[in-house]
């Protein structure tokens, strides 16, 4: 054994005495590579072995090491620019990652995203964002988006971005989960995901108004019918408000108002101060619905002068103003002789 073995001021020293065999002996010690050293630059460690005998030359064995980056580790997340897209709308996905280890290196990062059923990739929408190195591979094939990066030695965020279109055939209000796989080949793969919930398209209302008699006599009753429907397939009318102010010369027939058509029925149907009001919500079909009411032509209405009855049918985006015209006539006379 050495008669002396110590470390002082960064120098390892050992001393042996009277070795008379041919067996190998070693001293062993450990060092830690500092974070501050230059990556890829050789460090040579030279020892000096000398024997206290002028016939033995000094021996200076060396060993080299080349410091490398630490193994990196990824952090990932996935975002979508619209969590509640309408049928037929385009949305944008963003898959982002970064190395979380200072002085670490991600030798390879692979990203894969299988586009779920109900979504359709938008051609040429795939792109990468972030500092160099750019991805060595970035493509979409058969509904799968893939990217590959190599030799990332910083901690900056990089992203791949692509767009999809929500198919008209998907089920409204049923969540679609899009999950990516981001693999740094050293640690268990990350699986960031994001959820969207498809919504109906915006509906658009079409309206018309009819009267059952265009030339009523003074004192007669006539029936008005205001009809409307959604004209957009897979569209939704969230709210429809109908208002009809009964013109001068006409008088509402009490209790005559009613609604016709499939559910949903109107939440509100009333007549107040000569105004007929109806309100519908959440219409998702394209069927026709109507409100119907009667008026009586007043005796003092001017014969032969047109009375225009205009309604407002408002879907909060594209209001319509259907109208119907009547021309009051004299009552039938009766002769007395």
Positions of predicted regions on the chain:
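Exported/extracytosolic protein signature
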Residues: 1-337
